[in-house]
Amino acid sequence: MASADEPLVRVDGLQKYFYENDGLLDRLLGQEPTAVKAVDGISFDIKRGETLGLVGESGCGKSTTGETMVRLQEPTNGIVEFEGKNIYDLDGEGLQQFRRECQVVFQDPFSSLDPRLTIGQSIMQPMNVHNIGTKKERLERTKELLEYVGLSAGQVDRYPHEFSGGQRQRIGIARALALEPDFIMLDEPTSALDVSVQAQVLNLLEDLQDEFDLTYLLISHDLSVIKHVCDRVAVMYLGEIVEIGPVDEIFKDPQHPYTRALLESVPRASTEEQGRDRDVITGDVPSPRNPPSGCSFRTRCPSIIQPPGLQMEQDAYREVTEYRTRLETGRISIKSRWDLVGDPDKEDTGAFIESLRDELFTHTFAGENEEIIEESLRCLAEDDTETATALLTDRFASICEQVNPVLQDTAHPSACHLVEQPAHITDQVREWEATRE
């Protein structure tokens, strides 16, 4: 058992990749597997009795992280320690003991219960598997659990379809408590529920945590849920944790641009908030099959760092960055643009440039910046994407795409070049900046 000073759960360098083109036929045809980096080297710990929130947009890897932490998925790399033991080394009795001490509450209360079983049978299933108590003792324990979660012991013989969504989620929570676990992974436990029911379930989880000394990992995309329940928050983007810290600090003083943008997306009721400046996230989420170099958020970041010596309005620089991203990801079709111009013979280069410029930019440019952008558009008109991309990279490349920032060894770290980075990252930044002089 971990000492009082040690975390109950410790995650170190956890990776979970899924591979495409990796079947037998693909191999016979000589195709290379493509890695989808769902979780890409994350590290954090959870203290006993704590609730850690894991928040981010859909598809960022939150649920995969949770599933891998409880061995519903096997990792590609990294370790998860529970009470000081690497869970991926466990088998036999050791693995069975871990299953007892670690439970899950799933997102969808409608599909997480077997419709052919009564709710009593569903709650008793874990006790049956682990051979806990006699049949009579299991039934009594089940009735106690139903009352703990705000239902009636007399409902033990009813079927799931006889209950509302909120009641079904309470049943799922009762099932998770059946083995008296120390740790529960809550995967979006309220997202499928009406707003009026969400607070009831969250309050229940808090009451149960106090009564049974539980430790939670709460996965959610809803920041209001995170703020209501959690002690600390880890913010996840494209398979990586970009910021982690105490919940009050995260909400009052977010350090990472992605965290700030998430918080800005939360509706504000106060009229004093009208007309406030907002960091709006633009662009599409990159594919985990081919994540961006450097900081994974840099293709959408409102605060992306300009190269030394380049003095532009930040919004104008963001437009150039989006133009570069579209070029690099093949999202500018030269043929379609000529068709839109109505010049299939590709003779009116000026019309091509004007059409594309109107779509890409709302700002005007001057001097060398204008010359580079104009020349890159001209190269596109000539179907020379490689030169167009190189011109933009030479002039507008950011440190954010060259050096990947990391989380500092502090209570509130942020993986961003806008906050102080460790010495080895700072050295890489200086080396790159020296090449730009």
Task: Label every model-predicted segment.
Residues 178-182:
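A short, proline-enriched helix->beta-strand linker immediately N-terminal to the Walker B motif
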Residues 85-86, 136-154, 263-264:
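Conserved ABC ATPase "signature" region
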Residues 87-103, 129, 250-254, 286-292:
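ABC ATPase NBD coupling module
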Residues 189, 193, 197-276:
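P-loop NTP-binding/switch modules centered on Walker-like glycine-rich loops
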Residues 78-89:
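Conserved ABC transporter NBD signature motif
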